[in-house]
């Protein structure tokens, strides 16, 4: 039961996407019913704090491999490191998942304990030295496509504050959200360029075949949890209801920004940065 409760908590910031990025999930949190459900979740798990979500992350890369992988058959049976609900999703895809802390990933790749791994982004991945054990980096994945950080505030302390001071905390979290997201894009892109230019890392976009299979994995995992836990299903249904309306508008209204990028710079996979 405790494990299911923690999985419910994970459900707020990992996946499946339903077309949403982490930015839209934060919109659901604040204006789509997510906040009330999250407070219920914290009470169920036994955490006595108020959580402010901030810094929505770009989708996490699929990660580091010994070669370019393009087909589901390329990764089936592969020993791979990830954590959270993504372990269930990628296991459903046929991968052999190992949950390892960040500091153990690079040594595990070096010794062969795992054959592939993800951690978070080009900056943290390079700090762990992943470029020293792999030269094949796959960007874009649905395994953890909408994560964010959280600022926890003791509930008793928060409730003792005046409404004005509570509002200051909330809006400070919003400010940190935007500022850190802007900084992350600058930092991640600069470190990706360093990986490509100084360490000769090959960078790929994860294939649609693999992405589609990840979504099928999510369907299975979410379906299994929905059957076991009505509250988990309640959270999922709320997200789906929000995504169906909001993303209908957003995805139909957004032009193809990749088309505009390639109009200026050429095929994205061949652009040198």
Across the structure, where does each feature detected by a protein language model lie?
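Signature of the catalytic double-stranded beta-helix
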Residues: 24-40
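N-terminal secretory/targeting leader peptides
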Residues: 1-5, 9-24, 40-273
């Amino acid at each position: 039961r405790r494990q299911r409760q923690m999985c419910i908590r994970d459900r707020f910031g990992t996946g499946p996407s339903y077309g949403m990025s982490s930015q839209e999930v934060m919109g659901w949190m604040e204006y789509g019913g997510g906040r009330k459900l999250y407070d219920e979740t914290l009470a169920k798990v036994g955490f006595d704090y108020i959580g402010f979500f901030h810094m929505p992350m770009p989708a996490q890369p699929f990660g580091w491999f010994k070669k370019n992988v393009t087909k589901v058959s390329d990764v089936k049976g592969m020993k791979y490191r990830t954590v959270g609900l993504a372990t269930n999703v990628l296991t459903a895809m046929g991968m052999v998942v190992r949950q390892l802390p960040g500091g153990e990933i690079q040594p595990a790749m070096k010794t062969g304990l795992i054959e592939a791994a993800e951690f978070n982004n080009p900056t943290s991945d390079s700090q762990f030295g992943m470029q020293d054990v792999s030269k094949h980096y796959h960007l874009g994945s649905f395994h953890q496509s909408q994560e964010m950080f959280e600022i926890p505030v003791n509930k008793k302390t928060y409730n003792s504050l005046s409404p004005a001071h509570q509002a200051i905390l909330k809006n400070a979290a919003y400010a940190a959200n935007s500022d850190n997201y802007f900084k992350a894009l600058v930092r991640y892109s600069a470190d990706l360029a360093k990986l490509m230019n100084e360490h000769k890392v090959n960078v790929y976009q994860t294939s649609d075949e693999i992405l589609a299979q990840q979504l099928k994995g999510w369907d299975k995992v979410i379906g299994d949890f929905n059957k076991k836990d009505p509250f988990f299903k309640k959270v999922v249904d709320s997200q789906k209801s929000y995504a169906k309306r909001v993303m209908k508008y957003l995805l139909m209204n957004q032009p193809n920004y990749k088309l505009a990028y390639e109009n200026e710079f050429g095929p994205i996979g061949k652009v040198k940065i």
